[in-house]
A protein has these predicted regions:
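Internal, conserved structured core segments that host functional sites
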Residues: 52, 60-108, 128
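Short, hydrophobic/amphipathic alpha-helical packing segments
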Residues: 66-74, 125-126, 164, 233, ...
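A conserved C-terminal secondary-structure "cap"
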Residues: 150-244
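Catalytic cores of processing enzymes, dominated by hydrolases/peptidases
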Residues: 94-174
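A generic structural motif
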Residues: 8-15, 84-90, 179
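Hydrophobic/aromatic beta-strand patches that form the interior of the parallel beta-sheet core
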Residues: 10, 55-57, 86, 138-143
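N-terminal short beta-loop-beta anion/metal-coordinating cradle
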Residues: 1-61
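Solvent-exposed alpha-helices and their adjacent loops that cap or buttress functional pockets
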Residues: 44-51, 77-78, 132-135
Length: 244
């Protein structure tokens, strides 16, 4: 946001949405004065160009009253005549850091890649997307997979970069990301060192690379549309799923 003109235009009251033992307030000192920062959701109007503004919603996932929270979110979207709601998210998956991180995109609730359909627990971005569709909004949902072997809650600049690039594609503009690209390079270099220093992890990543490359190759062949090739791809993917 710091690369563009942005203005805070509203927020969702924190009352009733958060468990403060889970989403704890933070203490900080600003110009010598101690302040407490409570978890809350803030909306920013970001001027990408004179003709394109993004309404960005930033805040921790609420612990309670998700439906009410989403209704307030959509109320802001209607107030600012939002034409498309884009939700972003990440999840841990079995993928190598040495390849492009897998991206899953759905438009108006329809998955672009049926093979990557997700079944399981969901978070507030999914609820926003689903309720926005019910309210008549156009929606795009973008999720990136992060290597699960990294673990922890450390930021993943590569995942952020790939989400950013997908967002740029949705809005149809080049968005500035030079600083983020540098952080992504540093992240990959750090992961390389970590893997090289652990023989078991090194072997695991080798297997993930092999599986990833096999799937990409199978998808490329499948694009030819030949029935025999389609069957071959299905058999290859079934084999990969059965690997330990």
């Amino acid at each position: 946001m710091s690369k563009y003109r942005s203005l805070e235009v509203g927020h969702i009251s924190r009352d009733g949405y958060y468990d403060y033992q889970t989403s704890r307030p933070m203490q900080c000192v600003i110009q010598g004065t101690r302040r407490i920062l409570w978890p809350q959701t803030v909306f920013y109007d970001i001027a990408v160009t004179d003709d394109l503004h993004l309404l960005a919603q930033l805040g921790p996932e609420p612990n309670y009253r998700w439906m009410d929270y989403v209704r307030e979110t959509l109320h802001f979207a209607k107030q600012y005549d939002v034409s498309r709601i884009v939700t972003l998210g990440s999840m841990f998956a079995e993928c190598p850091h040495t390849r492009d991180l897998p991206i899953d995109v759905s438009v108006d609730g329809v998955q672009s890649d049926p093979d990557s359909e997700y079944n399981g627990p969901i978070g507030i971005p999914h609820i926003i997307d689903a309720m926005a569709i019910e309210e008549g909004f156009d929606t795009t949902s973008i999720w990136v997979s992060v290597p699960q072997y990294l673990g922890g809650n450390e930021p993943c600049p590569q995942a952020t970069l790939e989400l950013f690039q997908q967002l740029a594609s949705v809005v149809g503009l080049y968005l500035k990301a030079q600083e983020l690209e540098g952080k992504a390079d540093q992240w990959r270099a750090h992961c390389d060192v970590m893997v090289r220093n652990n023989a078991d992890l090194d072997g695991y990543v080798d297997q993930l690379e092999h599986d990833y490359d096999m799937k990409q190759h199978a998808r490329a062949i499948a694009s030819s549309g030949a029935p025999a090739v389609e069957q071959l791809v299905q058999e290859a993917e079934a084999y990969l799923r059965d690997l330990p």
